[in-house]
Amino acid sequence: MAHRVVIVGGGTSGAVAALSALKEGLTTLIIEKNGCLGGMQTTGMVTPMMPNHMPNYPRCALDMEINAELAKFSAYTEELKQGEKATCGSFNPIFLQAVLDQLITKNRGSVVFHTAVVDAIVVDGRIDCVIVYNTGGLQAVRAKCFIDCTADAELCRMCGVGLFSGNILLKSVAESVEKSQRHMAHSL
C-alpha cells in the first residue's frame, strides 16, 4: 500500500502528527521501534501531562479528543493546583497506549511496530525512501512526505540535515528573545 505520509517515531508527537494527517484524509504510516505508541509517556511511564503555562491554556482538538477517550476508561484526571493557571493531568499509560492505537486504527492509519529506520535515500534534496529493518528483513518504504518524530532527530541526521541541540539552541533562542525585547523597548 502506498502512503502519502510516513512518520518515523510513534511517540506522543508521532501519534498526534499521524492523527492530524489522517484527519486531513492522507494515507499515513507510523514506523515505531517499540511495541506501542506513546513513547516516554507510555513506555517510560511519564504520566503527568504538564501544563503549557500559556495564557488561557490553549489546547488543540486532538489533545482534547485523546483526553476524552482516556476519561471514558476513568484513565485521565485533571487538577488545578493552587496558584496555577493551568491544569496538570494524570493518566494511565497502559490506557494511553490503547487509546492512541484505537484512534489511529479508527482513522484508518497504519503502524508497523518493532521496526527500525536504518537509512534514508535522498535524491535531489528530498527523501525518496527510508530503509527499515524488522523481522521481514530490509525493506524500502516510500512516501510523498516524511515526518521525523524520533526523539533525537534520527531521520534528519540520516539525511544530513544541520541541527542545533542542547545549550547551543537555548543560547540562540535566549539571544533572539533578548534582542527582540530591546527592540520593543526602544520602539515604545
Where are these regions (language model features)?
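Beta1/beta-strand and adjacent pyrophosphate-binding region of the FAD-binding site
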Residues: M1-S13
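Core beta-strand elements of the Rossmann-like FAD/NAD(P) dinucleotide-binding domain
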Residues: H3, G136-C145
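Short hydrophobic core segments
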Residues: V8, V141-A151
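Conserved N-terminal/central alpha/beta ligand/cofactor-binding core
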Residues: S20, L26-T27, E32-D119, V123, ...
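Conserved beta-strand-loop-beta-strand element in the redox core of flavoprotein oxidoreductases
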Residues: I121-A140
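Glycine-rich loop(s) and the adjacent beta-strand/alpha-helix scaffold that form part
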Residues: D148-L188
